[in-house]
Design a protein with these regions (language model features):
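N-terminal, polar/charged subdomain of small-to-medium soluble alpha/beta proteins
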Residues: 1-79
Length: 79
């Protein structure tokens, strides 16, 4: 999953990309239909002077297919 996410974020030219799989913390939780729980950190000069919410929306937009396909259930984004 890390590579799938990283490849979709290449257009942001990230200087820093960190990925953490938190799925093991959510095993058996109600509403979890099998998609993973992840945390990511993305630092890019393209985000300079961009509000936090807009940065997060940009990142989520690039990963939308992974959400739609059920591969990501929850994602914590720091950008």
């Amino acid at each position: 999953m890390k590579q799938s996410i990283a490849s979709r974020l290449k257009t942001l030219e990230p200087r820093i990309f960190e990925f953490q799989d938190d799925s093991h913390l959510h095993v058996g939780h109600a509403g979890n239909r099998g998609g993973g729980h992840y945390s990511i950190l993305v630092v890019s000069t393209l985000f300079r002077d961009t509000p936090r919410l807009e940065r997060q929306r940009t990142v989520k937009g690039l990963l939308q297919d992974l959400f739609s396909d059920g591969l990501i259930h929850a994602l914590s984004i720091k950008a």
